[in-house]
Curated annotation (Swiss-Prot):
Subcellular location(s) per record: Endoplasmic reticulum membrane
Listed GO MF terms: cholesterol binding; cholesterol O-acyltransferase activity; fatty-acyl-CoA binding; sterol O-acyltransferase activity
Domain notes: Each protomer consists of 9 transmembrane segments, which enclose a cytosolic tunnel and a transmembrane tunnel that converge at the predicted catalytic site: acyl-CoA enters the active site through the cytosolic tunnel, whereas cholesterol enters from the side through the transmembrane tunnel.
Residues reported in the UniProt entry to bind an acyl-CoA: N392, R395, N398, H402, Y410, S433
Reaction(s) catalysed (UniProt annotation): a sterol + a long-chain fatty acyl-CoA = a long-chain 3-hydroxysterol ester + CoA; cholesterol + an acyl-CoA = a cholesterol ester + CoA; cholesterol + (9Z)-octadecenoyl-CoA = cholesteryl (9Z-octadecenoate) + CoA; (5Z,8Z,11Z,14Z,17Z)-eicosapentaenoyl-CoA + cholesterol = (5Z,8Z,11Z,14Z,17Z-eicosapentaenoyl)-cholesterol + CoA
Signal peptide segment: none
Membrane topology, as annotated: Multi-pass membrane protein
Ranges for region Disordered: 1-34, 77-97
UniProt PTM comment: Polyubiquitinated by AMFR/gp78 at Cys-280, leading to its degradation when the lipid levels are low. Association with AMFR/gp78 is mediated via interaction with INSIG1. High concentration of cholesterol and fatty acid results in Cys-280 oxidation, preventing ubiquitination at the same site, resulting in protein stabilization. Oxidized at Cys-280: high concentration of cholesterol and fatty acid induce reactive oxygen species, which oxidizes Cys-280, preventing ubiquitination at the same site, and resulting in protein stabilization.
Source species: Mus musculus (Mouse)
Assigned keywords, A-Z: Acyltransferase, Cholesterol metabolism, Endoplasmic reticulum, Lipid metabolism, Membrane, Oxidation, Steroid metabolism, Sterol metabolism, Thioester bond, Transferase, Transmembrane, Transmembrane helix, Ubl conjugation
Phenotype seen when the gene is deleted: Mice are more susceptible to high-fat diet-induced insulin resistance.
Name by which UniProt lists this protein: Sterol O-acyltransferase 2
Topological domain spans for side Cytoplasmic: 1-119, 188-199, 256-296, 373-420, 468-473
Amino acid sequence: MQPKVPQLRRREGLGEEQEKGARGGEGNARTHGTPDLVQWTRHMEAVKTQFLEQAQRELAELLDRALWEAMQAYPKQDRPLPSAAPDSTSKTQELHPGKRKVFITRKSLIDELMEVQHFRTIYHMFIAGLCVLIISTLAIDFIDEGRLMLEFDLLLFSFGQLPLALMTWVPMFLSTLLVPYQTLWLWARPRAGGAWMLGASLGCVLLAAHAVVLCVLPVHVSVRHELPPASRCVLVFEQVRLLMKSYSFLRETVPGIFCVRGGKGISPPSFSSYLYFLFCPTLIYRETYPRTPSIRWNYVAKNFAQVLGCLLYACFILGRLCVPVFANMSREPFSTRALLLSILHATGPGIFMLLLIFFAFLHCWLNAFAEMLRFGDRMFYRDWWNSTSFSNYYRTWNVVVHDWLYSYVYQDGLWLLGRRARGVAMLGVFLVSAVVHEYIFCFVLGFFYPVMLMLFLVFGGLLNFTMNDRHTGPAWNILMWTFLFMGQGIQVSLYCQEWYARRHCPLPQTTFWGMVTPRSWSCHP
């Protein structure tokens, strides 16, 4: 046993040397910056656990919110109506079952794509294009006139008499703020005796007066004072928006009032919820919406700055690429060759204008108001640029308007005509959308030229039924973009020609047929 002791001590000493060597190696490894694998693994396990807990918590909140919305939308067919008056009309149900818009907290798609460096580079390319337009404008002015100055004549002309347009907006907004809510309050009273009938009749009269104010006042002011296009655009967009919001508020609340049995009254929704609805970026009324915890004012300022940048971009495009081409076109003899060349020339500016309108309004403007009001659901559009069919393009281009058309035109059409009349209901959606789009163009430009009506209703309707969701693949996406390019070129070319033809060939007196007859077909001074 004696000889084994030194051997054991020798092994212990060897073990201590190995341990010291290991510690020394660890120190050297730390000195040279090599990560400790065990500590790195533990750190990654902690990060994974934290991430899974956060994802599970957010998913649970999302499912709870979706379940709550589904319970609110579930038709109470087999349940008796409550004997007591409910606290709000948000818990009443529609007269017929159907899909309802569910609002959840989510970011806009472009905000998500901006987190990717490759997409930010595309955004930077558009900014570089604006810089090139500014530099080219300065260079041309310096060469031709010997001065360096950016003129914003087109922008100043377009927004002329803007204070008058804003003053006209005030009674339009006050009418929308007071009349629908007061009418609902009159209808929600207990139905007993002739007092309720008198109040209901008074509510109908108020709604008729409200419709007259919204429909007649902006048209009268625009025609009488000859407002320029951008000021008219403010009025017509607010006119259509307030009409759609008024209809949505009454459509979502009135059925619950008239479903109450026994002549008992019902509490209308709170006035604050209606006031919030008038400003939040949605056309579907709900008494509550998902809200974000705080307001990012730098995000609001950035979006408004981008709106201003898009306005400048559009003015430079029109001033540099459209005005020089179409200003004197009506002075020349008409030829098919000149018309085709003008349409092809206008495809580039037209698609640029489409992208600028989309980014400025559907992304920047709506996100700015959503952030100021802490409105959580930012899905104002979807990835329409990836569409392989025009049916998908129409659904994803403007989700805000599509939700309104789907809820109150398509679904109500199916309820009135039956589930088999899907084609008729879809045609009704196209007809309403085409007429409103043509009305907006007629209001803004000051003349009737049904280019948008024909493109939207005829060609758009045919493409919607022929290029449907069954077609997939990159070839169909290329075809969709080709039709978009051509459609924008046709619109820009024909509307610009008509605009300058009415300036070069004014009528001796204003008549109805003179307003609705295209002047560019006969104006060749």
